[in-house]
Amino acid sequence: MRVPYETMLAEFERVLKKYGFSAERAHEAAEIFAQNSLAGVFSHGLNRFPRVVEYLRKGEIDPAAEAVCTASFGAMERWDGQRGFGPLNARHAMARAVELAHQFGIGMVALGNNNHWMRGGTYGWQAADAGCIGICWSNTCPNMPAWGAKDSRIGNNPLILAVPRASGEHIMVDCALSQFSYGKLETLRLAGKQLPVAGGYDENGQLTTDPAAIEKTCRMVPIGYWKGSGLSILLDMIGTILTGANSVAKVGTFGDEVGLTQIMIAIDPAKFQSADLTDAVIDAIAADVAASEPAEPGREVRCPGMGEHRSRKENMELGIPVAEEKWAEVLAM
């Protein structure tokens, strides 16, 4: 089943207005969810929307709260998200980081006490659309064991790196520090599919490709094993230092995944060189990667983010594929 983009956008907007968003903020927030689905990231679009509505019902998200700057020093600012709607606070924080980058060459906003930002790639792409290199990350609740541990005490803290192209076909890595995000596990489970490689442990402590088994144990495998574990810990430390807000351990005491710590960094390469030269560098590296001999005959080797352009085009033309039970849930709200 496919749903037109404008139809999905309108339904998200309708529901958000019902739960206290102003017309302007409802449209901007709905656009983030619809754009994520358009890009093929259903785990942080349609599939995640009902959970956000549940947080609104429970009062975990204040639809009217907006992030405020609490400290500023040159190219750096510290913001308090005031437990508002995560994606809007994150979008505004990255917009400010871009402003600072255009002024100073680099800009950073440390956003504390925010709620889930949905898809982190939204903000990397946002920076790239403004001609900037985007770097951002968020911590999470404790949802992954540190390497060598059984119990979950670290987060699968998503990390995003994006580089701009004048064409808009940016190159971007958007990855949780677990082998798969929980959203991806849900998407594959709903589709009745297994993971392509082991992503976590089952109740017997065995590596498994069954998404439902991993969701049950909450024992995911960090990317790169000990390397992903270490990266998760350091991102949490850096973010908590810069925001003065909540660590993964502290978030774990809140009951729900709220009050998160997020870092937005934008770098303006135009301070060093022209956009044409930046494009030439990116194009040369991308072409070299694409010239790789594929491990499987006929399979394309490409840079991260390039599949998103195709998904956007196809889904805008044909409609966005949806899990029917999730779409029905939204229509009933």
Give the ranges of each region predicted by the language model.
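Acidic, glycine/proline-rich low-complexity segments that act as flexible tails and inter-domain linkers
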Residues: R2-V3, L9-A29, A34, F42-E60, ...
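Phosphate/diphosphate-binding glycine-rich loops and adjacent basic-rich segments that engage nucleotide
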Residues: M144-A213
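Secondary-shell segments that build the walls of catalytic and ion/ligand-binding clefts
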Residues: K193-V251
